[in-house]
């Protein structure tokens, strides 16, 4: 259902990571007008009093749509599509079965690939300075992703 509204007051918080890119990408695909506050996850910006009042989890991404507030990239993306999508942009599945298959795929990507492997590789690769090196974990995570996508 596309809620055509010229007074859309969406604010997206977060930038610089795949998880923060997801809601931005969906908002762009939907042609939504939004304000971006590009704060980073490891910069201290999520720990400010202003941001903590908005989002006590102190994580990004975060979405404000008027008075409605939501965190978690997958939840934000689904919310934006369900509220603002239509046949000319992105739209929610037509049936419960299609929704279930979408949920299955999203759960696999987020739970199986991202949390168990891709994030391990990011932590101990690009973010090794923060989290430490773990070559064995990197190899195991990479091999797991390859097996799952084969």
Protein language model annotation of sequence segments:
Residues 73, 77-99, 107:
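Helix-adjacent hinge/juxtasegments
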Residues 97, 105-150:
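GST-like fold's C-terminal all-alpha helical module
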């Amino acid at each position: 259902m596309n809620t055509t509204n010229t007074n859309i007051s969406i604010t997206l918080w977060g930038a610089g990571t795949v998880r923060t890119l997801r809601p931005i990408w969906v908002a762009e695909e939907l042609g939504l007008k939004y304000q971006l506050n590009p704060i980073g996850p490891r910069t201290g910006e999520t720990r400010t009093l202003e941001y903590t009042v908005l989002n006590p989890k102190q994580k990004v991404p975060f979405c404000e749509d008027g008075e409605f507030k939501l965190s978690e990239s997958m939840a934000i993306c689904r919310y934006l599509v369900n509220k603002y999508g239509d046949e000319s942009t992105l739209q929610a599945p037509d049936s419960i079965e299609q929704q279930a298959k979408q949920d299955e795929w999203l759960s696999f990507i987020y739970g199986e690939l991202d949390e168990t492997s891709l994030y391990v590789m990011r932590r101990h690769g690009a973010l090794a300075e923060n989290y430490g090196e773990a070559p064995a974990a990197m190899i195991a995570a990479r091999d797991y992703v390859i097996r799952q996508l084969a």
